[in-house]
Curated annotation (Swiss-Prot):
Its main location: cytoplasm. This is Phosphoribosylformylglycinamidine synthase subunit PurQ. It holds the Pfam family GATase_5. NCBIfam families: FGAM_synth_I, PRK03619.1. Keywords: ATP-binding, Cytoplasm, Glutamine amidotransferase, Hydrolase, Ligase, Nucleotide-binding, Purine biosynthesis. It comes from the Bacteria. GO terms for cellular component: cytoplasm. It comes from Prochlorococcus marinus (strain MIT 9313). Part of the FGAM synthase complex composed of 1 PurL, 1 PurQ and 2 PurS subunits.
Amino acid sequence: MSIGVVVFPGSNCDRDVRWAAQGCLNIPTRFLWHETRDLNGLDAVVLPGGFSYGDYLRCGAIARFAPVLESLVEFVARGGRVLGICNGFQVLTELGLLPGALTRNRSLHFICEDALLTVESNRTPWLMGHQRKDSLTLPIAHGEGRYQCSDETLCQLQDDDAIALRYVNNPNGSVADIAGITNKTGNVLGLMPHPERACDPVIGGVDGRGLLQSLLG
């Protein structure tokens, strides 16, 4: 079992993900610079939070053209598991691996707080260790985390059982309280909360461990 963590210019949560996976759970982890195309030997890839390429045009809009993501599309097509956290979720929507878009929070302010979540679906292998309606508390930290999509896309997400996580108190105005979604096959999960920041009781909680522990079967 081995995880790759993509590093874009402007990423700032890549080391947090590596620490959570390798430091807390002993899962071998290596960094993937945005220019690489080599995903050989990896069982899963994580797109971390941060501000890829400065997010100058739109969150994730430049990162979607990175060479590593060309290989990632092929990796997903082969059934490889991908986790997009915060900015990583934004990148996945820009890349077209997940539907919808992440826009400015309804308050127009950056939000940094713990969010109470409900597991809506455990169909994705990333949430196989949880039961539906489990409660999780995970940190959020974003200015553009408001999930939006068309009515048609929302119906499709519901039909595919692809809404993975919902906010209990919806801090950013996301449609249908959505905090995380999967692709149709379930091997790709994008979420705005930060599970890597909730893997050690010393810093306030372990509710994020389950997503990474799922890699261990």
